[in-house]
Amino acid sequence: MHSLQAKILDPRLGSDFPLPQYATPGSAGLDLRAMLKEDSVLGPGQTLLIPTGLSIYIADPGLAALVLPRSGLGHKHGIVLGNLVGLIDSDYQGELMVSCWNRGESPFTIAVGERIAQLVLVPVVQAHFELVEAFDESQRGAGGFGHSGSH
């Protein structure tokens, strides 16, 4: 297991509400909570930037973190991430914030301390551009959207 530096920015985290943790031994994501001052109603089409009460420092440039939606919130209630996926760079040290968007048709109440997203560590491979005049030919070539076949 990889070590991850974290700072608690909201004293309710770790006392009133559990610290981010893996739900099962096979879980890929750590649950992030809505550390709001009070419950908040998110109307249809609205977005809200939600603090998690936590900052992390990954430090290792070979890693990054992704903030991903919780599948149940999206499927059952239409609550997804406003930016679809959040990318946390290894050198970022600020508070983790979650942009929530209600794409559903009904208002949804986000409760204080509710699990709203998950944090997943992923490997990163940085690349440098090698400028060329032409590419070696491939089977696909420049075929774009829908080029590889239907369904």
Swiss-Prot record:
Annotated TM spans: none
Required cofactor(s): Mg(2+)
Keyword Magnesium: yes
The protein's annotated pathway: Pyrimidine metabolism; dUMP biosynthesis; dUMP from dCTP (dUTP route): step 2/2
EC number(s) from the headed UniProt entry: 3.6.1.23
Entry's Gene Ontology cellular component terms: cytosol
GO BP: any one term: dUMP biosynthetic process
Annotated residues for binding of substrate: 70-72, 83, 87-89, 97
First-level EC class: hydrolase
Keywords assigned: Hydrolase, Magnesium, Metal-binding, Nucleotide metabolism
Any one Gene Ontology molecular-function term assigned to this protein's record: magnesium ion binding
Reactions catalysed: dUTP + H2O = dUMP + diphosphate + H(+)
Domain of life: Bacteria
Stated family: Belongs to the dUTPase family.
Classification via HAMAP family: dUTPase_bact
Task performed by this protein: This enzyme is involved in nucleotide metabolism: it produces dUMP, the immediate precursor of thymidine nucleotides and it decreases the intracellular concentration of dUTP so that uracil cannot be incorporated into DNA.
Entry-linked NCBIfam families: dut (TIGR00576), PRK00601.1 (NF001862)
Protein name (record): Deoxyuridine 5'-triphosphate nucleotidohydrolase
